[in-house]
Amino acid sequence: MTMSASAAAPTWHRLSLLLLPALVTIAVPDWMYSLTHAIDAWVYHGFFHHLETYASTMFPPTYYGTRLAWIVPGYVAYHVFSPVAAAVILHLTFYCTAVWSLYSIVRRIAGSSAALFSAVAFGLYLPAIRALGWDYVDGAVIAYTLLTLALLMAGLEANRRWLTLASGVAAGAMLHSNIGAAFMFPSILIWFPPDRAGLVERGLQPARPWRSLAMQLLWWGGGIVACTASLSIVSVSAGGNWDFFMPSFRWMIQQRLVNPWDVTGFSWIAMAPWFFLPAAVFVASLVAWLLPQGRRSLTAGRQRAIAALVLCSVIFAVWDWAGNGALLYTYYYTSWLLPWSFIAIGAVLAGTATRANLDVGMVLVCALAMAFSLVWPASVRLPLGGLAGLALTIAMMACAAVIRQPMPRRVVIVAALISLHGWLSATTDFGPYPDRADGFQVINRGVGIVDRYITADQPRFLLTPPQKLGHYVQGLTSIYLWGYTIASDKFPEVRPEQARQIRAGTRVVVIAEQENAAAPFDQVFAPYGLSGRVMGSEQLTTRHGPLYLTFLEALEVPPADASQSADSQTASPTPDRP
């Protein structure tokens, strides 16, 4: 850390960062919405709406509900604002936190020019946009990681313990967004030892540097404890447990040896372009470290930026190989490497511009080129891909490490990022998906409908086989933890083990793309001694057609009545009586 905070960021830098979300929204209008069929993202959206009910009666305790550092801000947003306004405010807050924190970090290491370049590149990089724009927890992990390091560097530089305490609070929030983020702690802790040369330059060398380090660590740890205690109070207030984090810890231990989503070998690399950038920056940073001409320009801050990326990457690789697997193959875990990758890009690879007019031009070209690549036509495909794409990305980043002039370096980096957008847009997870905005509206309307009938206890969903609206149904049922509540997805076909999930008093929701799909309920469940009392029928309109929701309460049928109902050729749910 060699750059003093006293070198204030130019005003036009602040304006550029303030305009960045608007540019992203113009290029990717639906960036604040989750994929309509993304199960886990909608699970957390459900917690935003129903934290107290889920924590106390409906789903206690699940490891999903332990991610309170992400759930609580979402809960506040969705209980103060309308769904659309809540989504905008929530995701803009985390997006801006991440971008501004990255700018602050790189500015302290390499100056404001490199900081602005890396912040703009990060803010317009598609995996970062998607991570910070959907309701899954990886965006929260990214934002809290960058905020942790930004506050820590500010606190250590000025010897202000309250900033170190605040950094600890952010670290606790990172941990309680996903307990696996504990593996990023080593990459944060390496920033604690004092940079003696930098302190001497500014006349801040303490008499006992290691005692000062110990005190900073204590204050930082105190921040983590304070964050955990605060979330424990929230958990108890919502009807949950004070040790809200334990289900996540136990789940992680159980998953240590077996992961049903694991992939073997290395063939997955060619199909995972989100892995290309961290891998390329990793290699390029090592090139910058190993080359004599590059090593001479590496300050302590730049060395730590490289070490943080290398350390986190090695931990991820070991975790992927020796742990539960599929970590680097899964884009919402690989995204955790983005903070360290873009810190290294800004601190090590971008270089330091000395001419302000060139700096302005480079940032403008970078922003416009990357924004254009975000609207890359789906019909256009880059000639290279797979392993050739990975090799090309590594080659371009390595070139950036050996080029001496900052402007050519940045041109090469931007070219690599634009190429990555081309390969990413060809994948199902990052490619065009026109139903994000409509899915958000439909699912939130669906939540309003379901909430009129389902209050405290878990519902059970009976789904007819999907035709063209299955992604809407998957998103809506994910609000209610999907596999926890779906009894059958082929209704009226119901297996005995599925039927046993429905007992007298259970509230059942039949979702179908045709009207009267709930009619066979009595006939199907008569052998199990149940009939259905219709509570209501609703229609949920999507841009592709309507969904029909029928709400029933399962009632116990006496054995004689059940046998008669089973023999009946035509059966329908018992109508609600006045």
What are these regions (language model features)?
Residues 89-109, 147, 151, 287-288:
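Transmembrane-helix motifs of polytopic, lipid-linked glycan transferases
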Residues 133-140:
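Short acidic/glycine- and proline-prone juxtamembrane loop motifs at membrane-interface regions
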